[in-house]
Amino acid sequence: MRSLHDVPAPAKLNLFLHITGRRADGYHLLQSVFMLLDWHDTLHFDRRGDGQISREDLSGMALPADDLIVRAARALQQATGCRAGVHIGVEKRLPAQAGMGGGSSDAASTLIALNRLWQLNLTRRELQRIALDLGADVPFFLCGNSAWVEGIGEHITPLEQAHALPPQRFVVVKPEAGLETLSIFRDATLKRDHAHATIEDFAADHYGFGQNDLQPVAERLQPEVKKAIDWLNSLKLHARMTGSGSAVFAPLTQTIDLKDAPGAWNVRVCSNLQAHPLKDWLKDESL
């Protein structure tokens, strides 16, 4: 196999995000549902025989020289001893500093695609172990489904069968301004003692359950977040922030006119995915 083109890297929304504590090493403990969305970046992979990792921006958005895509490819080389290389073309559509997991999803799709392109035959669990060092959200994007996530992001329960999320459309708003995740988690006013919930609690009201504990801090640090939420609420929608922002979203329960949104905002109507588009590219370990 010489190439894999048009490989999707879907976004996620946090349907809720509760901070339940903080470890001695400073990492925050959370509970959340990460939901896959049909808004995605697209990656293209061409095998190289010289072992080099190269990357090309195809969308006009400047990318750092050592972003998560490159780091994921190098991590897979190092973990397996693979001597093959790759040239990666990136069509970047997902906004940065949005709380939608764009960089983490790119890294996960890179691991999945190179596992196939380089014929490594690693299992889903093996790739997730490699992904842990790339970022807390990367293992989720390898699990194959939307998921209930706990701990610092390492405890992942796919939402399948009886717990599968019902189909739903959403309006997603990304204000022009972004937010740095660390600035929110370091804020002295962040509440870190949310009571633990269960999947059964969440299942009683999939798209209305809980809250985002990071949202009050984000609204104070970046007023555009509150402005976007207020705009969606004025349309009689139930809006909240995803992740550490600055993107916000609301389930669509009616037809709405999006033309009144400020021109600098990125406004998009999306649907949830029933499974990751690359789910079947990985095999699960036998029990």
From Swiss-Prot:
Keywords for this protein: ATP-binding, Isoprene biosynthesis, Kinase, Nucleotide-binding, Transferase
EC number: 2.7.1.148
UniProt pathway annotation: Isoprenoid biosynthesis; isopentenyl diphosphate biosynthesis via DXP pathway; isopentenyl diphosphate from 1-deoxy-D-xylulose 5-phosphate: step 3/6
Reaction(s) catalysed (UniProt annotation): 4-CDP-2-C-methyl-D-erythritol + ATP = 4-CDP-2-C-methyl-D-erythritol 2-phosphate + ADP + H(+)
GO MF term list: 4-(cytidine 5'-diphospho)-2-C-methyl-D-erythritol kinase activity; ATP binding
Domain of life from the UniProt record: Bacteria
List of catalytic residues: K12, D137
Cleaved signal peptide residues: none
Entry's Gene Ontology BP terms: isopentenyl diphosphate biosynthetic process, methylerythritol 4-phosphate pathway; terpenoid biosynthetic process
UniProt keyword ATP-binding, yes or no: yes
Pfam families with a match to the protein in the record: GHMP_kinases_C, GHMP_kinases_N
Root EC class: transferase
Residue sites binding ATP per the record: P95, A96, Q97, A98, G99, M100, G101, G102, G103, S104, S105
Chain's role: Catalyzes the phosphorylation of the position 2 hydroxy group of 4-diphosphocytidyl-2C-methyl-D-erythritol.
Family, similarity comment: Belongs to the GHMP kinase family. IspE subfamily.
HAMAP family: IspE
Protein name: 4-diphosphocytidyl-2-C-methyl-D-erythritol kinase
Taxonomic source organism: Delftia acidovorans (strain DSM 14801 / SPH-1)
Gene: ispE
